[in-house]
UniProtKB/Swiss-Prot annotation:
Acts as a GTPase-activating protein (GAP) for ARL2 with low specific activity. One of its GO terms (cellular component) is stereocilium. Residues 1-31 are annotated as: Disordered. It is found in: Cell projection, Stereocilium; Cell projection, Kinocilium; Cytoplasm, Cytoskeleton. This is ELMO domain-containing protein 3. Residues 9-19 have a biased composition (Basic and acidic residues). Both isoform 1 and isoform 6 are widely expressed. It comes from Homo sapiens (Human). Its main location: other.
Length: 381
């Protein structure tokens, strides 16, 4: 891969994963008749002027099962009968030959084999501390990452410097796979278009939403949807993101969580766990998934809306960095129960016998600290 394959943002936009998180212009507007939030260009800071937040507080927070009408089923069948369009050429191709899904390991191998040296030079693997902060970190901070794991850590941070290149076939397959696994579509879609807004990107081009996390944000989404253990969780969080009152931009929220993972890695919050497992990438992936699970749980149970997003994300970052091991343990327990049909973020509890503990018994780190609160300074800007 040459430098054109990975677009590197300026220091102001992306300084070792600390840059401006997301662009403005992805905010909800309100349909009074249907009580639906649609993200169509109203700045979040302006929501209070449109009566949206007041209206949200008056709605009943009930989960209503949606009945799929025959018209919807027919439309879906007609859509699936349409020939797919290849993103590289824009020409029609046989619907019997859709693009092949790509696994996380295959996508990772792509970055392990191409030349990323121009981007690796620009990373700052750890936070630089001086004075009392350095002394305090030395005496009371987490352990240093083992020397043999630092190359793997640097690869993670280097991928976070790379942007999305729509001309790179691997990049395109990653996007296609994420879209298909979340929507259930069997066919390819254009790499630019309004359909990406349905997944929670800001606009028609997903590349514009990766600042602060780079291509690592897409690799994390790929991991979430291609791992058979985390796919049900990803689908549940995606459904939560489309709730008629509590909806939020799924992919933008995921980018923010990847940014938290980058910061936790650079601040050595994950070093102890990486040293214990003798690997970095799986730990970072699990930390990302565990943090996303915690956010979804708080969002669902505390009835958060988009106006709470800034506060929730700031508190989430503090909690995730403080107690990564507890988050990872919660994820492990949750996935084990989901595999047995005993836990669900959205649906009713399923217990098959007295030995099956309810999902509410899982300990979510710092849950009591996240009280209902609205914040004007949101991260989705």
């Amino acid at each position: 891969m040459n430098e054109k394959s990975c677009s590197f943002h300026s220091k102001e936009e992306l300084r070792d994963g600390q840059g401006e998180r997301l662009s403005a212009g992805y905010s909800p507007s309100y349909d009074k008749d249907k009580s639906v939030l649609a993200f169509r260009g109203i700045p979040i800071s302006e929501l209070k002027n449109h009566g949206i937040l007041q209206a949200l507080t008056t709605e009943a927070y009930e989960w209503e099962p949606r009945v799929v009408s025959t018209e919807v089923v027919r439309a879906q069948e007609e859509w699936e009968a349409v020939d797919t369009i290849q993103p590289e050429t824009g020409s029609q191709a046989s619907s019997e030959q859709p693009g092949q899904l790509i696994s996380f390991s295959e996508a990772l191998q792509h970055f392990q084999t191409v030349d990323l040296s121009p981007f690796k030079k620009r990373i700052q693997p750890t936070i630089r501390r001086t004075g009392l902060a350095a002394l305090r970190h030395y005496l009371f901070g987490p352990p240093k990452l083992h020397q043999r794991l630092r190359e793997e850590r640097d690869l993670v941070l280097t991928i976070a410097q790379c942007g999305l290149d729509s001309q790179d076939p691997v990049h395109g397959r990653v996007l296609q796979t994420i879209y298909k696994k979340l929507t259930g579509s069997k066919f390819d879609c254009a790499l630019h278009g309004n359909h990406w807004e349905d997944l929670g990107f800001q606009g028609a081009n997903p590349a514009t939403d990766l600042r602060g996390a780079g291509f690592l944000a897409l690799l994390h989404l790929l991991y979430l949807v291609m791992d058979s253990k985390t796919l049900p969780m990803a689908q549940e969080i995606f459904r939560l993101s489309r709730h008629h009152i509590q909806q939020f931009p799924f992919c933008l929220m995921s980018v923010n969580i990847t940014h938290i993972a980058i910061q936790a890695l650079r601040e050595e919050c994950l070093s102890r766990e990486c040293n214990r497992q003798q690997k970095v990438i799986p730990v970072v992936n699990s930390f990302y998934a565990a943090t996303f699970l915690h956010l979804a749980h708080v969002w669902r149970t505390q009835r958060k809306t988009i106006s709470d997003s800034g506060f929730v994300l700031k508190e989430l970052e503090v909690l995730a960095k403080k107690s990564p091991r507890r988050l990872l343990k919660t994820l492990e327990l949750y996935l084990a129960r989901v595999s047995k049909g005993q836990a669900s973020l959205l649906g009713a509890q399923k217990c098959y016998g007295p030995e099956a503990p309810p999902f509410k018994d899982l300990t979510f780190t710092g849950e009591s600290d996240l009280q209902s609160h609205s914040s004007e300074g949101v991260w989705l800007i």
